Amino acid sequence: MKTTGKKLVIVLILFLAGGTMTSCHQQSSSVTNTMSTSQLLDKIKGGWAGQTIGVSFGSHTEFRYQGTFIQDYQSIPWHEGYVQELMDSWPDLYDDIYMDLTFVDVLERVGLDAPIDSFAIAFATADYNLWHANQAARYNIIHGVKESGHWLFNPHADDIDYQIEADFAGLMNPGMPNSASEISDKIGHIMCYGDGWYGGVYVGAMYSLAFISNDIQYIVEEALKTIPIESTFYQCISDVIKWHKQYPDDWKQTWFELQKHYSEEVGCPDGVFAPLDIDAKINAAYIVLGLLYGNGDFTKTMEISTRAGQDSDCNPSSAGGILGVMLGYSQIPEYWMQGLRGAEAKKFKYTCLLYTSPSPRDRSVS
């Protein structure tokens, strides 16, 4: 990825690495992980590509399946040039990505110690549309409410919003989940609290761990250590892990268990008395459902996280991004890459960022 006229901040990680990246995994400080610059770049690109593929794949199913899953006999469109078609005709589909990139842009312009208000003002005054917790936070920021994401002022605080835009935190902290969580502590509370914030912390940690492990079970379980054990979010994801072990060949049985135990939407006004469930934990569970039952298979992961329903573009986006980091851009199957091609040299609307890979001569900070 690169920008027009400036270098993207995630690429700066590669410069500072001096050809290799060394990570001391913070929860196992005796373990050191080293990778080459080219491997790191491949994984970063894989994360952004997987995220974009996922949100595009689930585009026409989002919230059409509430309290039910998409049957196996129902096909989901995917074809050559599909992402470019969607970027041209439906740019607001990519709200999770343009929020992600807004935060990346602030970090590039202001630095890693950028104050909280720089992130808040950036998305509150942006031209793009927002929904739920993000939109409520935008309203609060514009009207001077400082705790813009707190449940007392934002009825969507437990919604999925930060969870779907926390990818950058893990992508910019390879192998360092605690550092990813520190960024999430600063930014995630602008629009979410409680489960909504925990979801972003968890997703960011999974992205971070995907740089240093090819074991999906490890990534899912280790990332959960960033979440308080007494929280309902922790309990929900822990149950998914338990049910996966109990029903290792039947993701639909685990889906039914989730529906029975965690399908209540008690925060978002749009879902309290309706089948809609945009709560972070149930949708995070569908991310994990795809990752565990997909077990490293990109197609299975996409299919399951999408077919689980509810926010079925954002969930495969998160799952695809995490798996894209683990596998690397070069290992994403051709079936999925055909849909992405043509969009790689196209800017995301509302941003100056695109997917084109930096050439060796771009590797400078001048």
Where do the PLM segments sit?
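Bacterial N-terminal signal peptides that target proteins for export
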Residues: 2-9
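Bacterial N-terminal signal peptides
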Residues: 11-19
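C-terminal motif of bacterial Sec signal peptides marking the signal peptidase cleavage site
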Residues: 22-23
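Active-site cavity-forming subdomains of large catalytic enzyme subunits
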Residues: 41, 49, 99, 104-201, ...
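Active-site-surrounding "flap" and adjacent substrate/cofactor-binding loops of secreted or lumenal enzymes
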Residues: 60-90, 97
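Accessory "access/gating" subregions that flank catalytic or transport cores
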Residues: 150-157, 171, 176, 189, ...
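Catalytic phosphate/nucleotide-handling subdomain of diverse soluble enzymes
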Residues: 291-354
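Conserved small/polar residues in nucleotide/adenosyl-binding loops
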Residues: 355-360
